[in-house]
Amino acid sequence: MLTADSLNLILAISEGELVEEIVIALLASPQLAVFFEKFPRLKHALTQDIPRWREQLKTRLKEAHVPPELEEEVIGYQKSQLLSTSQFIVQLPQISALLRRVGSPFADQAQRLIADNPHFTPALHTLFLQRWRLSLVVQATSFNQQLLEEEREQLLSEVQERMTLSGQLEQVLVENEDSAGRLWDMSDGKLRRGDYQLIVKYGDFLADQPELMQLAEQLGRSREAKSVPKKEAPLETFRTLVREPASVPEQVDGLQRSDDILRLLPPELATLGITELEYEFYRRLVEKQLLTYRLQGDAWREKVMQRPVTRQDYDEQPRGPFIVCVDTSGSMGGFNEQCAKAFCLALMRIALADNRRCFIMLFSSEVVRYELCGRDGIEQAIRFLSQRFRGGTDLASCFRAIAEKLQGGEWFDADAVVVSDFIAQRLPDEVVNKVKELQRVHQHRFHAVAMSAHGKPGIMRIFDHIWRFDTGMRSRLVRRLRR
């Protein structure tokens, strides 16, 4: 079968000009003009696709097959070029029959040339072939234009779908030119309108929670930096966690003398039932001399202190990817679930703007993984946002999955973020030791985003930084009143 590309070579037709005309017509379409005006940051991203459009149009010409009638006529023309004038005169009846059989536009003109010139000279032979070629060029050009026009319509339809998707998500995910380009690349997928509306929904929720967006900005843009010492150092405020033992009972740690009725030893409680010892019991109660269980725990609170500023002139280090672990237990349902998903969406926005990767892991009874900044990032984000938080809490599996991920070479400078209410069991010692090794040896940073004020201090103290976003009703009302 003869392809359109081969036909153009035979007839010496330049396909480059045809392709360029189609590209210009595509860029001049009213739909794109309106889109560029409404979303200027996406204009540059879209124009980066122009080389791909050219290649797609050229590929269409290379792969398309010409109609059988046109192919037969071209083959007849090629054979006629090889004939001498005397041979050509002998073949004229067959050539005329061929032109009529394939329905060539040149058939009538050829018949007139034959009828008007009973004696064919070499000049008429050349004229006949020139006009035949001209007719073939017109047919080939028309066929090329038809093919390219169909491809233009298909391209325009594809671009319109991507424009609709990118336009809807621009406000949610685009922060600068880089993120606009990455969003445009990710829009090259098969998504329906109802799918990406879920991202718009959580984007609207995030807009209603500016404190959550601010928290994501602080976490996402925080990074240790090299600095230069300065002699005259002013004081600066810094926050640190201080330990307050015995304020949060977690485990039995011996005996003590006190007046705590709820933690009395059974022998002490027995004296209360003996008449002769009842007054002795009350005396020891007043003097806080009753034997009781001592329950010891590790409570930590944030303390604000002053220290001299010893470093200035920061040289910020490059930021690495995010590995975000999200608790999907039942206690994280409802408003907590909305906040956790919106927070991850905010981190995705930051990752797109800073050309970073954002890897999400959901942990409950099993670990589910999503990468939000790959080529199929939008589809992955939709799947993540569609999840329901109804599982259990297995924080240890979460840390094991993070540690395994950080072993990969491409994640050597990643930041780990755990989003949870941290109402869970104690972490095994081997998990705690592994996290400390990653922090000490490999300089990985672990962030906690605490969605509750009741998280276990024993779990949270392994993190480098704790970002608090209390989702309790009181905190929600306070934030609303502050706006």
Curated annotation (Swiss-Prot):
GO cellular component: cytosol
SMART domains for the chain: VWA
Pfam families: VWA_CoxE
InterPro entries listed in its UniProt record: Uncharacterised_CoxE, Uncharacterised_ViaA, VWF_A, vWFA_dom_sf
Record carries keyword Cell membrane: no
Keywords of the record: Chaperone, Cytoplasm
Primary localization: cytoplasm
Localization of this protein: Cytoplasm
Assembly description: Homodimer. Interacts with RavA.
PANTHER family: PROTEIN VIAA
NCBIfam families: PRK10997.1
Family per record: Belongs to the ViaA family.
Its job: Component of the RavA-ViaA chaperone complex, which may act on the membrane to optimize the function of some of the respiratory chains. ViaA stimulates the ATPase activity of RavA.
The protein's name: Regulatory protein ViaA
